Amino acid sequence: MRIASFFTVLLTLLTLNIAPASAERIRDLVNIQGVRGNALIGYGLVVGLDGSGDQTMQTPFTTQSLTNMLSQLGITVPAGTNMQLKNVAAVMVTAELPPFGRAGQNIDVVVSSLGNAKSLRGGTLLMTPLKGVDNQVYALAQGNVLVGGAGASAGGSSVQVNQLAGGRISNGAVIERELPSTFGASNTIMLQLKNDDFSMAQKVSDAINRSGYGGTATPLDSRTIQVLAPHGNSSQVRFLADVQNIEVNVGIQDAKVVINSRTGSVVMNRDVTLDSCAIAQGNLSVTINQQANVSQPNTPFGGGQTVVTPQTEISVQQAGGALQRVNSSANLNNVVRALNSLGATPMELMSILQAMQSAGCLRAKLEII
């Protein structure tokens, strides 16, 4: 009985000490080299705007584009005609040609104002050819522009929510030309890790070789795994369908903190840890106030001149911050709680995290985008 109880306790302890390893499919970890989208771009016109289009006197290319388009439709605009248009806007149209895109397939397009149009809401994009980097037309775009923002103005005041100078057309372009593909022509396929990691490259290679494809996968560097595959399109499709569903134990990921310097957003993964440190955060504010004073001569008919003299006041205020202790934190919840205790704004938190990394208190890679 004692021996049975001992083994029961030992088995329980071993179960508690073994942390479950997280597994992810290979399709979530890698991209297939050569299977990617291609950028398309075009220039076009959006019409039907409710007086919110380009100011043609300031954007002459809009008038020129409209004249050329009307000429192609058989309508001649007399030379020297000054067209005061308010319902037309010049736009740039972008899209992505998906991998293995076929003629007749629809893709989404993004429409962005090129001139000084106030809003593209309610506009219609006229037929616009979309070209690739080789200057060949691969798709044609046309349709009603969907704008996510909203705005109104009256009496010199205006209110705007989100962006009005850009929109999207769902399935707004039709593929007219297909890209040549070499898929299936070679018996080797290159898998590229989304994040370079030597250990992950080895794990992916070992997982493929253990799943009935022994000797087919070889890691070449920290990002690329070479896989031997059967020849032919249909054979490689079946092969990749099996390989992409193989699970890999990813283990512990690199601790990383990502900071967006434009918006002040701070994002960190679950592996970020902190060491104990003391932080003092102070704010320095400079206020400049300038007023224009009018100086007039004392005698009305003395021949003097009225002058404007600026008066400037500058004040500097510094809000001192006391040292605050930040305890060491071993998990993400404690890290968030410790950073929130500082009471810092996101922009201040960016500077604090940089200083903590320099002091060796932030155990993570700091990436600023």
Curated annotation (Swiss-Prot):
Alphabetized GO MF terms: structural molecule activity
GO biological process, one term: bacterial-type flagellum-dependent cell motility
Subunit structure: The basal body constitutes a major portion of the flagellar organelle and consists of four rings (L,P,S, and M) mounted on a central rod.
Record InterPro entries: Flag_FlgI
Subcellular location: Periplasm; Bacterial flagellum basal body
Disulfide bonds: none
Any GO CC annotation of this UniProt entry: bacterial-type flagellum basal body, distal rod, P ring
Record protein name field: Flagellar P-ring protein
UniProt organism field: Pectobacterium carotovorum subsp. carotovorum (strain PC1)
